[in-house]
Amino acid sequence: MQDFWQAAAAQLERELTPQQFKTWIKPLAPVAFDEETHALRIAAPNRFKLDWVKSQFSGRITALACEYWEAQVSVQFVLDPAASGRAAAYMQPAQPGMGAGGMDRMDHHAAPGTGMGGYPGAQPAQTMGGQAPFAMPGQPAQPGYGEYPTAAAYGLGQPQYGHPTGNPAGMPSAAPVPAGARGQGMGQHPGQHHPQHNAELGEIDVVQMDPAEASARSYRAPQQGQHPHAAMGNGAAQMPGHQPSDTVHERSRLNPILTFDNFVTGKANQLARAAAIQVANNPGKSYNPLYLYGGVGLGKTHLIHSIGNHMLMENPRARIRYIHAEQYVSDVVKAYQRKAFDEFKRYYHSLDLLLIDDIQFFSGKNRTQEEFFYAFEALIANRAQVIITSDTYPKEITGIDDRLISRFDSGLTVAIEPPELEMRVAILMKKAAAENVNVPEEVAFFVAKHLRSNVRELEGALRKILAFSNFHGKDITIEVTREALKDLLTVQNRQISVENIQKTCADFYNIKVADMYSKKRPANIARPRQIAMYLAKELTQKSLPEIGELFGGRDHTTVLHAVRKIADERSKDAQLNHELHVLEQTLKG
């Protein structure tokens, strides 16, 4: 067993970045191997590492075990706080040919398409610790900017966290924590345990905390049919059918799969990503609040989950909450119904990081806006980080109190634009690699050229292509892709015509449709006309001469000039890029 783990660790060290190996693989230790059942048990020192290794590396470790023993091996990951101490004994350099079977050949057997041992998202060039520091456009790179913390920052002997499951609106009560205690374990004492209760379902989270804090956290939410005030006390009742689990990500509602590592970066989102990394490394100190806006499926949610996951890696005790705006509204309503606003406030006002998605859903919800205003003020005063996403710029949101709008504007506001062609291709290739499927580059370019709006549309198209290829037993080619997406491409081509583009642009820029064909050259007419030509080239299959004919019989060189000019300006002008995105979304319905 020791020989296996030495060889497996050596192989994983070759496949991973130094930071990934040091953080996730080095603390593991094999516990036992059953020769009869071929069952292998591997221990992790704390719950956070256990959950992450199971989700990200279990497949590769299982494959290495099967290859080593040349049999079907089942791998079980278990929790053992002493694992790190024993792990060092297994981390000696592996000797060539020491495997029981084919282990000495493992570095030739990484799963195709991943380049990183068979699991998605593990690419050295994209890891924060392995790439050049990020700098905001126009600024020099900052020392240490964009780096992951050292392995020591992940902490050994971390507490085990329990959390409720199946309850997205759960609100465990918590006492406010002084700003000085944040980032240092939030005032928790390693020897003190206390049940942390879920304010919606009455479920329990087992956490470690300071005795003084424990006395302030005695609220237990009522079960259904129970009077709100009957829940006070330290009891441990639970809703029937709900058992507490112990994944820190579920308690924070973070998706552990969404990280900076597997976030594809391009011109459209590089500023947002750089700002997100800066916030993740310095929460509450810069860019507070961070406000990200853009259309659906552009990566806003992925980015804010990445921030939360990075903070959890630095400090697993951090109080983090990801919540959609509609769920926050629901929390406010339930707190009102149960007369539990004190507990509601204690929880939300004591967070270290609040990630709230799609804030535009607060529109018209006056009581929710009032409660969020108080929470926002409390968090900022405590130097906690607030991150907000929306589909539009703060001042363009309707039905939101001016006080909130001014708070949203007080930090850093960054747009995430639709991905450019190269980025769309990169996204498709990375998604395909995650599925262990080889998609030819020309196919990725074909799909990216025809589908421009957002990442979800690209993912949906890729799934259709893969399913069509599997069902019909055909290799993925442009012809197969065209057949798989024929309905989608037909709908797009049918909906978008040059005439429709001209009308939409004329309405958007408040000119007459007739101006699209005229010879008038004032800037307020020529500019929209050039934009319409650009969109006609991008969104239809018309040739340059055909487009020129539809714009009053203009020469194809005039159309080409307009297309090149708008394309160049789009890459430099955020406002123009935003306008074009709005027009594209309008035309695509």
UniProtKB/Swiss-Prot annotation:
UniProt entry keywords in alphabetical sequence: ATP-binding, Cytoplasm, DNA replication, DNA-binding, Lipid-binding, Nucleotide-binding
Hydrolase listed as a keyword: no
Start and end residues of each stretch annotated as Domain I, interacts with DnaA modulators: 1-73
Cited CDD domains: AAA (cd00009), Bac_DnaA_C (cd06571)
Compartments, record wording: Cytoplasm
Task of the protein: Plays an essential role in the initiation and regulation of chromosomal replication. ATP-DnaA binds to the origin of replication (oriC) to initiate formation of the DNA replication initiation complex once per cell cycle. Binds the DnaA box (a 9 base pair repeat at the origin) and separates the double-stranded (ds)DNA. Forms a right-handed helical filament on oriC DNA; dsDNA binds to the exterior of the filament while single-stranded (ss)DNA is stabiized in the filament's interior.
Quaternary structure (record): Oligomerizes as a right-handed, spiral filament on DNA at oriC.
Protein's name in the database: Chromosomal replication initiator protein DnaA
Source species: Cupriavidus taiwanensis (strain DSM 17343 / BCRC 17206 / CCUG 44338 / CIP 107171 / LMG 19424 / R1)
Lineage summary: Bacteria, Pseudomonadati, Pseudomonadota, Betaproteobacteria, Burkholderiales
